C-alpha cells in the first residue's frame, strides 16, 4: 500500500495553471500533488555568442528552490556564491528535454529561457519542472507567433516527465517524498508525446533491480507520461 493510497500506476493529482505571472511570455504553476513549481518562459532576440550568425535559436533553463520549499530551511545558493551540483544537473536535464522538443533552426536567432522555481517540494521536482516548462514554452512560442517573431511553430510535440521506482518490492509511478526517500530504486523518465525517450535516469538506492523490473518501471512511466501529456493538451486548449 502506498502512503497516499494510490495504485501503483496512478500519478498524483496534476494541475497546470497558465498565465500565472504577468510579465513572462509563458508562465505556468504546475502542481504534482504537494509539489508546486512556477515555470516562466522568457524570449530574447539574441543567442549565445557561439551560435551567432548560424541561423539557429537556443532553449535553455534554470532551476532553483525557495529556502523553505522543503521541511527544513535550506540556505539560498546565492548566499554561498555558487550553484550546487544537484541544481546544475537538474537545470541541464530540463534544458536538454526542452531542446529535444524544438526545431532550433525554425526558431531562428532567438533564445527562450525557462526558469523553474520550486515553491514547495514533495518529491519529483525535476519531473514536475519539465512538465510545466513544456507548457510555458508552448505559450511563449504561441506569443512569438502572435507578435510576428515566428512564422510557424517550431515545437515538435509535447514533452513530459515522471518518476518511477521500486517501493516495498513493487514498481510504482510518480513517487512522493515518503516513497522517494525509502525506495529501493529511483528513476526519472522524460518522453515525447510520440513515445520516444529523451532521458532515462535510474539508480539502485538500496538493492539492485532486475531487467524485468526495469521494463516494468518503463511501462509505468510511459503510461504515466501519456496521462500527463493529456493534461498538458487540456491546459493549452483552455
Curated annotation (Swiss-Prot):
GO terms for molecular function: 3'-5'-RNA exonuclease activity; tRNA binding; tRNA nucleotidyltransferase activity. It comes from the Bacteria. One of its GO terms (biological process) is rRNA catabolic process. It holds the Pfam family RNase_PH. Phosphorolytic 3'-5' exoribonuclease that plays an important role in tRNA 3'-end maturation. Removes nucleotide residues following the 3'-CCA terminus of tRNAs; can also add nucleotides to the ends of RNA molecules by using nucleoside diphosphates as substrates, but this may not be physiologically important. Probably plays a role in initiation of 16S rRNA degradation (leading to ribosome degradation) during starvation. HAMAP family: RNase_PH (MF_00564). This is Ribonuclease PH. The lineage of its organism: Bacteria, Pseudomonadati, Pseudomonadota, Gammaproteobacteria, Vibrionales.
